[in-house]
């Protein structure tokens, strides 16, 4: 991860919470798709991208750009995905991302939406800013889009869905 060969010119680093071993495994198993995702981030003006979906590789990788007010921690969804890795990058705003443990299933996995929802009283939150991105693999039960400390402000985020390879 330190060599940043994977970055394809994008200068943002993975957050310290990212599972480096899983990242390396997935990158090598699906290199063309990961390279396309990182090239997309490096080659586009992320501030100018329109809100909505942007196809990177049909059925394998796409970006969703959104602007929103982050939720209070009690109202934020705790979720996981099996078919796609989440790359989440907050361009601006005041929010944090959580990694949950000791979870109970609230809503069973929906294969059409590639999501399961959980409850948990044990979530470790990390500040999200433009200096780093988060990767959430199928084993990472996460709580995105949670309001950070301080002023309640709008966030702009890009979520890239990247096909997970067993």
Q: What is each stretch, according to the model?
A:
Residues 87, 124-125, 149:
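Short, surface-exposed secondary-structure edge patches
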Residues 99-102, 144-148:
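A short secondary-structure junction signal
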Residues 119, 127-147:
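Conserved metal-binding segment of the jelly-roll/cupin
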Residues 82-96, 101-104, 109-115, 161-162:
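Short, conserved beta-strand element in jelly-roll/cupin
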Residues 114-124:
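Acidic, glycine-rich flexible loop segments
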